[in-house]
């Protein structure tokens, strides 16, 4: 942004280069071994297969969907940065900072999740996201904005992949593909609704209301997790 004087068109043309190299690598450099088809392929998304999924799995789907409603697109972090009178070329650094914190915290929290209840870790992640939402809602300076962005990155490091692990632990091995497909379907719908709702709140009531709404949904998710049968919380 700084080198091209905020010329978005030039920046996107430069971004085409790694995208083209990735496609070339997939097309000409990656060779997959041929595996013989030993049985007839069938559609696994059937009512009888869904009935085989445990109640613990469906609890994870419900909790994950509600949680996703609070995790609207990170584009709203960029929009918040624009309101702080940050120079245009520096605004992408918000996403850089968030992803840097995320990458630095993902491994240690992933290691920690191996030795503690996944539901407990998810609850701690929700608390961090609540803190991030409140800081971002109240921020009026770039320093508090960065604090909120850092908290958002920490919550990503704590929770990203955690729900996937919970799906894997609660679904039978032969139906894990179906379980992940249904979970991703519900999460995708929730993310679409979350981002659309966040946009409406932003336009009608202001930026702060968007982040406050995210915090409220996190609280609802925590309440839902407290209502989860204790046997399911030990995954």
Placement of each model-derived feature along the sequence:
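Transmembrane alpha-helix termini and helix-breaking/packing motifs in multi-pass membrane transporters
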Residues: 1-10, 193-207
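Helix-loop junctions at membrane interfaces in 12-TM secondary transporters
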Residues: 5-7, 137-148
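Structural signature of the two symmetry-related core transmembrane helices
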Residues: 16, 120-135, 212-215
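Short amphipathic helix-loop junctions that connect adjacent transmembrane helices
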Residues: 75-91
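Helix-to-loop junctions at the C-terminal end of transmembrane segments
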Residues: 1, 105-118, 202-203
